[in-house]
């Protein structure tokens, strides 16, 4: 009985978090298809064609591609572009495709940030725009109310969302039930719309109106925005609850609502100005606006939480500098708050709301990031099919090729909307890609320079003569290299002529798996003469904690008393140079990011009163 309750609870929670983005798409998808930047005449023929496109887009891109196929490609239970990237880079290590695929994964992560800025803006705007259905006089209040709602949402992030998070599931369940009931109520008026399930209507629409249908693809794809979240959030809820929630509630509710909007437009073509809020009687408009606003806030929360998670993954995978990561829940390790990400998103979202003014204007900006990410996911998962699942190559080509062809059609239909707003996610994607690759390249150059300057440990051990005194206690030297002597140790020997009785050379590494169990966290080897090499491993979904890791060294016969342990860190100062490696402007960007990174003591949770920092200068 308790297991059944847990399953139901997990299902309700999954509905509240996973399906928020795709669940709020009915607010604007049909409206933008018929009344957007490339309007389509509201006629039964066109309505049937668009409904058929919507149905098969949802079935192919979400149900078949993500729910059935890509959700099988988990990285030890975790999903998402960076988890998939880590899995694929591990599978292709040593192959020619390794580096290009890694770049593709970084591009997907960069596009995600463009998407995560647009989603809160377009979702909440589209909900509040329901006020215009009540009376056009309320139009002037749409942007201020949207800004107020979003400001409140971003302001509470630092306090965590555990308390209000319990309401997400029930509210979203109510939302999907409402979608279904509104759809059924309108389908009854024109039940013939259900015939649009047949793909012949979509095919005929494309053949008869090739240009119109091409434009329609650019807005029909709005019906699947958020589909990738089903894969991204797999680590939080598991594959089964997400699939169960999709097939039992979300998919039927979405399709019923889209077909209900189609039935409404057949009966009343004038309803195209905002078909969603005209699906019910007039007295329902205000309650629907309130419920829609709650649903879009929940959808936005899911995107914001996803942005925090991706930021942590990027830091751990060496794509971003250290940032402050705050755990907002003592019970749920996945609930984190990243201040820099939060406020960067907030100001970008505010700029979008104020700059674009309406969900219709923002719709043009929405599709590029989503379709670009979906296309990259298909490419990455094709290598999983071939190398991990060992599918026949002909089958891989047929399945991946078909999905890629569909993805590309939607991407092409959105790329033509660059001038109408599509430039924004491309701009954000370019900035994000530049930052991610600059940091990764910069750290690689730093490691190369340190290795070039490194002194072999055996040389130092031989040089420890009678003139070098041994201080009591333990010294832990943090170093990125797993061989050689850290610069901080060399500086200590040079200036103080002393080393501690026990010296630990500690290196923190990130595995290409989401989690590393405590049993595999540390590995300590005795080098001799009181020196030890310590490797500390974390997964890309974990936050490092060095004092906690040191307590695990008991298995190697070592105990650490924090009051007699000193931590020595190298504080690197970088000097941009004309050496080959990176353009001068990128070297300056890397230096700027390094200066503004969270201090190692904070990031690694090292007691500040036990830290000694020694400076070192490097040319990159």
Curated annotation (Swiss-Prot):
Superkingdom, taxonomy of origin: Bacteria
Any one annotated GO CC term: plasma membrane
Pfam families named among the record's database cross-references: K_trans, K_trans_C
Keyword entries, A-Z: Cell inner membrane, Cell membrane, Ion transport, Membrane, Potassium, Potassium transport, Symport, Transmembrane, Transmembrane helix, Transport
Coiled-coil region(s): none
Membrane topology: Multi-pass membrane protein
Cell compartment(s), UniProt: Cell inner membrane
Main location as per UniProt: membrane
GO MF term set: potassium ion transmembrane transporter activity; symporter activity
Catalytic reactions on record: K(+)(in) + H(+)(in) = K(+)(out) + H(+)(out)
Transmembrane residue ranges: 8-28, 50-70, 102-122, 136-156, 168-188, 211-231, 246-266, 284-304, 336-356, 368-388, 393-413, 415-435
Family: Belongs to the HAK/KUP transporter (TC 2.A.72) family.
Function per UniProt: Transport of potassium into the cell. Likely operates as a K(+):H(+) symporter.
Protein name in UniProt: Probable potassium transport system protein Kup
Encoding gene per record: kup
